């Protein structure tokens, strides 16, 4: 999602390294990646005609009114779970002047081999001089299923997830994650001061000291803030800690069409701003604006233009453009 957003909305050259199963669903996904303008480096796997390996299939009910959105998926025998260190020639990939490498907690939870692959890629990125970012995206279901396959309990799953993610985050420059991600994903304690509400940044900023104490390599931490009034009505903001300073985006009221992908939209806008040499405030607002606009259209990737994002970041409105 982040790579597609940066390509389609922000006009950057992007690429992904992933798995591809050679069967019709895989070819459909491959075509969509090409259409988004994203270069792909695939480790290909033959499909056996019956059981896979498969491409993950995700269903989303965007909800309406009092019916909340629901996301469920089938990741059985997923091709990406077969990826491991050595699956990609990182030296060749990063030789193409890559400036930023991004990964996340969902991919890291797919199998026992994917975390080591993430770290291998991060180490190669560092050697090439690229910025390394990571979205914690803590998903209890994914970690629980992976642990259950090894005969572990849910408590052991959470402990194992924190151990794995802490190892990965020790290689990261820019971290994306909210208070729950930081607590469950990294095993950090919550702040003593209670948050006044979903949009109050106190809880988030209150945890930064723990983050930087445990991970002195971290230069920036960011997340969105969202208060849900109904499925289609949200209050929306975002926060950024960068080089010791706190930044908070404005709060706006969103009429939401499809909330899935808003977080990736925020990350893409933030990364674009930082890559483009924008100020921390401008970068945060670009992420905030792009994430907001993404929730107004179906799907989890952007249909917005850079002009629209910049206008909204500067205080644009929903007045008709003629």
Spans of model-derived segments:
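Anion (oxyanion) recognition and catalysis
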Residues: 7-8, 34, 119, 123-127, ...
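Conserved N-terminal subdomain of the carbohydrate kinase-like
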Residues: 13-105, 148-149, 310-322
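A short helix->loop->beta-strand "cap" motif at the edges of active sites that frequently abuts
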Residues: 11, 127-131, 215-219
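Conserved post-catalytic alpha-helical subdomain immediately downstream of the catalytic base
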Residues: 231, 250-316
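Charged helix-capping and loop-helix junction motifs
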Residues: 88, 115-120, 155-163
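Hydrophobic faces of well-ordered beta-strands that scaffold small-molecule active sites
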Residues: 16, 132-134, 175
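Alpha-helix C-terminal capping segments
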Residues: 1-13, 35, 273-276
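Conserved phosphate/ATP/ADP-binding segment of small-molecule kinases
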Residues: 140-244
């Amino acid at each position: 999602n982040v790579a597609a957003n940066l390509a389609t909305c922000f006009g950057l050259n992007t690429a992904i390294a992933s798995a591809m199963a050679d069967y019709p669903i895989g070819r459909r996904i491959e075509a969509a990646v090409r259409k988004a303008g994203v270069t792909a480096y695939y480790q290909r796997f033959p499909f056996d005609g019956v059981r896979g390996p498969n491409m993950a299939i995700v269903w989303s009910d965007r909800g309406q009114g009092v019916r909340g959105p629901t996301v469920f998926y089938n990741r059985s025998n997923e091709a990406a779970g077969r990826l491991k260190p050595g699956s990609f020639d990182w030296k060749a990939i990063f030789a193409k002047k890559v400036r930023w490498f991004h990964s996340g907690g969902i991919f890291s939870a797919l199998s026992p081999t994917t975390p080591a692959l993430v770290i291998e890629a991060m180490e190669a990125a560092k050697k090439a001089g690229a910025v390394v970012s990571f979205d914690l995206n803590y998903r209890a279901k994914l970690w629980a299923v992976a642990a259950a396959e090894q005969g572990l309990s849910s408590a052991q799953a959470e402990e194992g997830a924190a151990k794995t993610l802490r190892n990965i985050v020790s290689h990261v420059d820019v971290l994306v994650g909210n208070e729950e991600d930081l607590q469950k994903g990294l095993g950090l304690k919550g702040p003593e001061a209670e948050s006044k509400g979903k949009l109050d940044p106190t809880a988030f900023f209150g945890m930064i000291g723990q983050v930087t104490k445990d991970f002195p390599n971290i230069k920036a931490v960011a997340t969105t803030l969202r208060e849900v009034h109904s499925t289609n009505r949200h209050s929306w903001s975002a926060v950024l800690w960068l080089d010791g300073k706190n930044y908070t985006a404005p709060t706006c009221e969103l009429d939401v069409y499809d909330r899935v992908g808003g977080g990736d939209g925020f990350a893409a806008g933030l990364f674009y701003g930082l890559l483009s040499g924008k100020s921390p405030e401008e970068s945060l607002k670009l992420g905030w604006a792009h994430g907001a606009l993404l929730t107004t259209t179906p799907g989890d990737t952007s249909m917005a233009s850079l002009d629209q994002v910049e206008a909204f970041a500067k205080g644009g409105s929903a007045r008709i453009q003629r």
